[in-house]
Swiss-Prot record:
<dbReference type="GO" id="GO:0009593">
    <property type="term" value="P:detection of chemical stimulus"/>
</dbReference>
<keyword id="KW-0472">Membrane</keyword>
<keyword id="KW-0812">Transmembrane</keyword>
<keyword id="KW-1133">Transmembrane helix</keyword>
<feature type="transmembrane region" description="Helical">
    <location>
        <begin position="138"/>
        <end position="158"/>
    </location>
</feature>
<dbReference type="GO" id="GO:0005886">
    <property type="term" value="C:plasma membrane"/>
</dbReference>
<feature type="transmembrane region" description="Helical">
    <location>
        <begin position="273"/>
        <end position="293"/>
    </location>
</feature>
<feature type="transmembrane region" description="Helical">
    <location>
        <begin position="20"/>
        <end position="40"/>
    </location>
</feature>
<dbReference type="GO" id="GO:0004888">
    <property type="term" value="F:transmembrane signaling receptor activity"/>
</dbReference>
<dbReference type="Pfam" id="PF02175">
    <property type="entry name" value="7TM_GPCR_Srb"/>
</dbReference>
<dbReference type="InterPro" id="IPR002184">
    <property type="entry name" value="7TM_GPCR_serpentine_rcpt_Srb"/>
</dbReference>
<feature type="transmembrane region" description="Helical">
    <location>
        <begin position="62"/>
        <end position="82"/>
    </location>
</feature>
<dbReference type="GO" id="GO:0007606">
    <property type="term" value="P:sensory perception of chemical stimulus"/>
</dbReference>
<dbReference type="GO" id="GO:0050830">
    <property type="term" value="P:defense response to Gram-positive bacterium"/>
</dbReference>
<keyword id="KW-0716">Sensory transduction</keyword>
<dbReference type="GO" id="GO:0005929">
    <property type="term" value="C:cilium"/>
</dbReference>
<keyword id="KW-1003">Cell membrane</keyword>
């Protein structure tokens, strides 16, 4: 069977078609919460400029991945309606090179950027007493450095690929790069799992030091922001690790057990993790991040308000009132002398 016959059998298989429609619709719906999060939540939030910039970079990278999915899955959904011959269903080599590069970048770059966010939060903890006045340069440097590293990673990933033959799917990594993809996925999962644990302990350390570093209002404010943003980073990291683990587990199960109950190549391709877990993650991360960010910001406002507001009732209120009266009498007494 040649490629034209194979892609024809795959493209019109019912299960495969359903998976393409699911992924396309999920990707389209993912755009809106991500745009809302970036434009109406992160852009106007009161976080330090460095961490705010990195969050915007991170979710913009995910948005790029989502838009890439919208284009390539729209191709796989629409072309079968328009194809005149079987070979029309094949993916052009030039388009395949472009969108596969963007696809790998969209998956790997957010996982490097989240490491940069952790590094920035560590710096914010170390320099908590003066970090309020730190310029945007740190966030820009970390964000650009993460993207340059990932671009180099993608370049070397496809270095030996010629992309001189049409492909059945945009998401079929060439056989010569298959081992690289496995290495990349497992390495990123391991690194991000360690990062998740590190973020958890970073929240604990921030909470402990917040009670000790109370020498100024600005320091207390910075420590409170450190706790809120590190919790948000921990949440993002957890969702990323969870879904990426599901993706790898799902892929291994299909690879090992799939041939036993999925009889055709089309059925095997239709239930690949890339068609299910990654689009679902892209949808959930936008919605869940909006919800958790709103919750954490309300928590931050309440705690900061409690820090700077005087109590007017109870024992604390009576003590504050007494101290204020004593200060007035001391001032009057000093004036008479």
């Amino acid at each position: 069977m040649n490629d034209c016959d194979e892609v024809n059998n795959i493209s019109y298989d019912p299960l495969y078609r359903y998976s393409q429609f699911y992924t396309l619709l999920t990707s389209i719906f993912s755009v809106f919460p991500l745009l809302y999060l970036i434009i109406f939540k992160l852009r106007v939030c009161t976080f330090n400029d460095n961490i705010k910039f990195l969050y915007i970079v991170y979710f913009t990278q995910i948005l790029i991945s989502v838009l890439n999915n919208c284009v390539v899955f729209a191709h796989h959904v629409v072309i079968p309606f328009l194809a005149v011959s079987k070979c029309d269903l094949l993916v052009n080599p030039v388009k395949n090179r472009i969108f596969q590069n963007i696809g790998v970048f969209g998956i790997s770059c957010p996982m490097l950027t989240i490491l940069g966010i952790t590094a920035e939060r560590l710096l914010a903890l170390i320099f908590a007493r003066c970090y309020e006045n730190v310029k945007l340069h740190i966030g820009v440097f970390i964000g650009v450095f993460a993207m340059l590293c990932d671009m180099a990673l993608v370049y070397f990933f496809f270095l030996d690929e010629k992309f001189d033959q049409p492909s059945i799917s945009y998401f079929m990594v060439p056989d010569t790069s298959g081992y690289k993809m496995n290495w990349l996925c497992y390495s990123l999962l391991a690194i991000n799992s360690v990062n998740l644990v590190f973020n958890y302990f970073l929240v604990k350390i921030n909470t402990i030091l917040k009670e000790k570093w109370r020498n100024s209002l600005s320091t207390r404010y910075q420590m409170e922001e450190n706790i809120i943003t590190t919790k948000f980073s921990t949440f993002i990291s957890f969702i990323h690790v969870f879904f990426f683990s599901l993706y790898l587990i799902f892929t291994l199960i299909i690879r090992l057990l799939g041939p036993g109950f999925l009889k055709t190549q089309a059925d095997l391709m239709s239930v690949r993790g890339v068609y299910i877990t990654i689009p679902t993650y892209n949808l959930i991360i936008g919605i869940a991040s909006c919800v958790i960010l709103r919750h954490l910001q309300r928590q931050k406002v309440a705690k900061v308000y409690a820090e700077v507001t005087l109590k007017y009732s109870g024992i604390d209120g009576a003590q504050i009132h007494q101290e204020a009266i004593l200060n007035v009498w001391k001032t009057k007494s000093s004036g008479r002398k």
